[in-house]
Every structure is written in C-alpha cells, then in structure tokens.
C-alpha cells in the first residue's frame, strides 16, 4: 500500500453560497454565508500544494459553479501546478456556463444529486438534471455521481444508480454524517448487496466499500463506520476526537484564509499566512500504518472465529 494514497486532498471552499437546500449538507464546516475565496488565497493554496506535492486539489463550496470566474480559477490552478489531480464537486446549477476547456482541464467531476423525482429535486437542489447529465456524458470516464442516501430516496436508490450507470457514470453513495442512521445504512447495504454482490473495502484517503457492475463501472459506498477505520496521526491525541462526525477526509481552505482539517475547526494552525498554515498542517495528516493494519487483521481474525 502506498502511504501517500492515504493523505487527503486539499479542498478549496471557493464560496459559501448555494442554490440548494439540503438539510444534511455540512457546508464544509463553514457558518459564514455569501463569501468568496479571493484569487490571492487560491494562489497561495496552489503554491503550497505544489511545494508539498499534494496529489489532489478539490474545488467545492457552497456551489462552485456560482463563481463567475470558475473558468479562470481552473486554468490558473492547472497552469501553476499541471501535475495536480484537479476535481470539482457541483450540483450542476450553472454547469452550462462552464467552458468546454474547463471541463477538459478537470481530472475529476463529481455531480451531486438526490433523485430524478421532480418533487425531491425541488425539495433539495432545484436543478434540471437533464442539463448537467447531457453536458457531462462526453466526460463520463471522469464523472462520478454523488448521492446522499436519505429516507426520501432509499426506495428508488437502485433505479437511480442504474440510470447513472446507463450514462456511463460511476456512483458514490454517502450517508448523513450527523444522524449516522445505522438502521438505514444496514437496510440499504443489504439491498445493494442482493443486487450487486458483496462489497469489498478499499483503502483510499477515505476508506470505502466498493463493487463493480457488469460494465465495470464503480459503485462506492462511503459509510461513517468504514471511514473511521482510518485514524490520522493528528486525531489520535485530539481532545475533541469523540465529538467528530467526520474523520478527516480533506484539508480545507476557507474563503477567509483559515485552514483546518476538520469540519468542527477544532484543529487550526498558529501560522499567519495561508501558505504556512498548509505547510504546517498537511504533514500531520499521515496515518499510522501499524494501527491501520492492526485493525484490519483483528477484523479478519474475528471473521474467522465467527
């Protein structure tokens, strides 16, 4: 296992404005509304990422396509750090305003949806999904559909997944971090296993359960319990560890220039500049491989005994 694979991405919160009203959205831990990250901070973030050879930068919000300069931002990042794996997470609201050149420059595109059912679309994200699906079809190989599983969409989940597969998209399923409804997760996992077979655990920066369909498209499940298999060095001695709903899946850079690896912002840096904060915090996000393998091997032993 390459330990570098376990280091999380640098996530740039480009703005805090969003067109959607998803009750489960954690807003990347941000409580400030209508704020945009200045280009100067974006530049510092990219410079730090290049210095540390961070493998992946993710653009998020809010809704990042609400940035009228999103094309310029993507171009800037790729010019300054061509080797970086650059992704964006969007609900597709203004995807039609994003240039083809930008879509080509992006290495990964994550489209967040809740359902294809009109009442649910109106309730949560208020986006005509036919538009982003049509735009992203030529980029299917680098597009993943993110779906948060809730009571509202669980009964139609397999049909939603299959429709995404029909477009050639991979699918990531997630669960509400705060509620962490074990009964819902168990019910959904049982249903998906009957349809797609047993899922295996894959160890990335966020551990996931994964299976493939007949066309070798990925179906990944991000469950809080599985994510917690991986404990980062910075978390081990943190007095707030028990209060975390999400174990670190990214180092977040916020529009006001503060940097934190956790949604609750308990862990911050004493450094002044954005650049120095990233250089200070990111190296602390490693994983104790002895701990990780110990957990995995204990799990294997318990399976043998049962």
Roles of regions detected by a PLM:
Residues 154, 158-159, 163-259:
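A C-terminal junction/extension of Radical SAM enzymes
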Residues 229-306:
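Flexible mid-to-C-terminal extensions adjoining Fe-S/redox cofactors in radical SAM and related proteins
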Residues 2-40, 52, 261-262:
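Canonical Radical SAM [4Fe-4S] cluster-binding loop centered on the CxxxCxxC motif
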Residues 28-32, 116-118, 178:
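A short, flexible beta-alpha/helix-coil linker loop
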Residues 39-59, 67-174:
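Radical SAM/AdoMet-radical enzyme domain recognition
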Residues 9, 13, 26, 58, ...:
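Conserved beta-strand segments that form the floor/walls of ligand-binding pockets within enzyme
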Residues 1-12, 21, 53, 209-210, ...:
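N-terminal [4Fe-4S]-dependent radical SAM core
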């Amino acid at each position: 296992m390459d330990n570098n694979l376990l280091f999380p991405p640098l996530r740039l919160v480009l703005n805090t404005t969003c067109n959607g009203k998803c009750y489960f959205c954690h807003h990347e831990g941000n409580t400030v509304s209508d704020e945009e990250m200045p280009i100067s901070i974006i530049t510092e973030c990219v410079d730090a990422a290049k210095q540390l050879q961070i493998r992946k930068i993710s653009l998020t919000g809010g809704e990042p396509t609400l940035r009228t300069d999103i094309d310029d931002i993507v171009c800037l990042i790729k010019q300054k750090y061509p080797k970086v794996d650059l992704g964006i997470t969007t609900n597709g609201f203004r995807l039609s305003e994003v240039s083809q050149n930008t879509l080509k420059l992006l290495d990964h595109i994550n489209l967040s949806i809740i359902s294809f059912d009109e009442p649910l679309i109106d309730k949560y994200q208020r986006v005509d999904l036919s538009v982003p699906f049509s735009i992203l079809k030529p980029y299917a190989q680098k597009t993943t559909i993110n779906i948060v599983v809730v009571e509202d969409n669980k009964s139609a989940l397999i049909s939603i997944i299959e429709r995404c597969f029909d477009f050639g998209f991979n699918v990531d399923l997630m669960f509400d971090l705060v509620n962490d409804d074990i009964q819902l997760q168990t019910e959904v996992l049982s249903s998906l296993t009957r349809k797609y077979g047993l899922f295996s655990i894959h160890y990335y920066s966020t551990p996931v359960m994964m299976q493939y369909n007949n066309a070798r498209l990925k179906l990944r499940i991000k469950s809080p319990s599985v994510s917690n298999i991986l404990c980062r060095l910075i978390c081990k001695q943190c007095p707030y560890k028990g209060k975390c709903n999400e174990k670190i899946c990214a180092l977040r850079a916020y529009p006001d220039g503060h940097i934190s690896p956790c949604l609750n912002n308990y862990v911050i840096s004493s450094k002044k500049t954005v650049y120095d904060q990233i250089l200070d915090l990111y190296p602390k996000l490693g994983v104790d491989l002895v701990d990780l393998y110990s957990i995995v091997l204990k799990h294997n032993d318990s399976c043998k005994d049962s």
